[in-house]
Amino acid sequence: MRCVVTGAAGFVGSTLVDSLLALGHDVTGIDCFVDYYPRKAKELNLAAAKQNSRFTLIEDNLLTVDITKLLDSAEWIFHQAAQAGVRASWGGYFRSYSDNNVLVTQRLLEH
């Protein structure tokens, strides 16, 4: 199966990527590497997957990426992308949370 995993570099997303690859699926992962967690930690999450020829990583924002190109050939889409840390969502980072948690999900569902 051809799978797309959003939030592929996060803890949950990268674990799912590894599981799908272990089952023999082709996986395209997308992540925008927001700075909530250190980039190095997210890159380590994907270290094993990057060694697999059936894995492709796209570093882009789901709000601006060509969603048709990303999703049209996928048989399964696993949406794991989200801005973590709920407390900060009610402060100065509200826009980031609404964009990355609500608008991105809406865009995927409308496709």
Describe each model-derived feature in a short phrase.
Residues 1-111:
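N-terminal Rossmann-like NAD(P)+-binding domain of SDR-like oxidoreductases, especially those catalyzing
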